[in-house]
């Protein structure tokens, strides 16, 4: 089972990269809807202020009746608050998707476990931490800003053997 979940989460992470450079200050997120071992929908967060990955993945499903017997895989915990878009956790509940697999929790204070809690309170089975390290690494800058309150910094240093910086 873990191998199967990792296969779909790897696809979520790959999809999420499609948002690179367009979603800041939000994180890159990918989502895949799976019905009986087959991907029936997928999406990613394309641009800041527009539909999130879960919304795009669900919208891409041709037969909505399959959602009630499907699993949605998401690289980051579904949001649970109203911002520029409505909460993805509410959409998942409304569509009747019974199972959600999450790569990593969202450290953003307005989400931070609330999305998972909202889903579980509605009777949705939620699995967290699938490929968590990879899911967190995808959004190093976002994670650093949310958890440490500072930008993610990369430093390159070049100096000669005698210690002179060039």
Where are these regions (language model features)?
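Zinc-dependent deaminase
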Residues: 1-22, 39, 64, 82-166
């Amino acid at each position: 089972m873990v191998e199967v979940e990792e296969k779909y989460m790897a696809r979520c992470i790959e999809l999420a990269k499609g948002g690179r450079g367009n979603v800041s200050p939000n994180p890159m997120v990918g989502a895949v809807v799976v019905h009986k071992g087959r991907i029936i929908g997928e999406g990613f967060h394309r641009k800041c202020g527009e539909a999130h990955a879960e919304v795009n993945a669900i919208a891409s499903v041709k037969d909505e009746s399959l959602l009630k017997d499907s699993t949605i895989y998401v690289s980051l915990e579904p949001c649970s608050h109203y911002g520029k878009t409505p909460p993805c956790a509410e959409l998942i509940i409304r569509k009747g998707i019974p199972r959600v697999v999450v790569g990593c929790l969202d450290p953003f204070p307005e989400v931070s476990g609330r999305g998972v809690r909202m889903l579980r309170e509605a009777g949705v089975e939620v699995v967290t931490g699938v490929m968590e390290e990879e899911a967190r690494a995808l959004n190093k800058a976002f994670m650093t800003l949310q958890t440490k309150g500072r930008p993610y910094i990369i430093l390159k240093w070049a100096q000669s053997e005698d210690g002179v910086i060039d």
